Design a protein with these regions (language model features):
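A glycine-rich phosphate-binding loop feature that marks nucleotide/adenosyl-phosphate handling sites
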Residues: 3-9, 87-93, 135-145, 152-153
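Short, histidine-centered active-site or binding-site loop motifs used for metal coordination
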Residues: 55-57, 166
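A broadly conserved detector of short glycine/acidic/proline-rich loop/turn motifs that flank catalytic sites
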Residues: 57, 91, 185
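A structural preference for short, pocket-lining loop segments at secondary-structure junctions
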Residues: 48-54, 67-109, 119-137, 157-161
Length: 197
């Protein structure tokens, strides 16, 4: 983790065999301390100055409460006690995206507020002074992918099904997905100094 530099994006794929059994055993033996939690997520101390931000909603959907605790984790990351933040969970899937019912409950204003909050969280992750690492697996859809793409580094499991699937229900990936996809397409060209148009 010390070698990771903020503001650079690295994608690593785990081996097809999944996580080695000795690593799982070591993780299960490692004591973790709960730092903060709410009904939507939790922050754990993994030791060595590393925090884990775990989603806890049904299907790990992105909710306002989840993002509130995510902002708290990013604030903690600014203190000297913490060196890195990992986003993952011990669930069947990483995240199926935004909780649309939660967002639509507030009408057009609620949808706009939920979208803005997700955008702000993604930008706060990108601006974090220390590494933010996403470890997606299985289903990582919509808002879950938007959060993943905002991380400084991505360590993806070999079994990863991902996409900006909002289009299927008539929604533009407005939580940062369009911007992050474009950034990935244009950025390599911009680094060479060429005009992408």
């Amino acid at each position: 983790i010390a070698d990771l530099r903020a503001r650079s994006v690295t994608v690593a794929i785990s081996p097809d065999s999944g996580i080695p059994e000795q690593v799982i055993e070591r993780l299960e033996e490692t004591p973790v301390a709960l730092v903060r939690e709410n009904d939507h997520a939790a922050i754990y101390d993994l030791g060595d100055g590393v925090m884990l931000f775990e989603f806890r909603t049904k299907q790990n959907t992105i909710t306002g409460g989840l993002l509130d605790l995510g902002f708290e984790a990013l604030k903690l990351l600014e203190t000297p006690d913490w060196k890195a933040l990992i986003l993952s969970n011990d669930s069947e899937r990483f995240s199926i995206g935004a909780n649309l019912a939660d967002a639509m409950a507030g009408g057009p204003e609620g949808i706009e507020a939920a979208t803005r909050k997700l955008q702000d969280f993604g930008m706060a992750m990108r601006a974090a002074p220390k590494p933010v690492i996403a470890a997606p697996f299985n289903m990582t859809l919509g808002g879950g992918l938007e959060i993943t793409m905002s991380a400084h580094a991505i360590v993806a499991h070999s079994e990863l099904y991902t996409g900006l699937v909002e289009v299927g229900v008539g929604i533009i990936p407005a939580g940062g997905g369009c911007k992050e996809m474009l950034r990935r397409l244009v950025n390599p060209v911009a680094r060479r100094g060429a005009d992408p148009h």
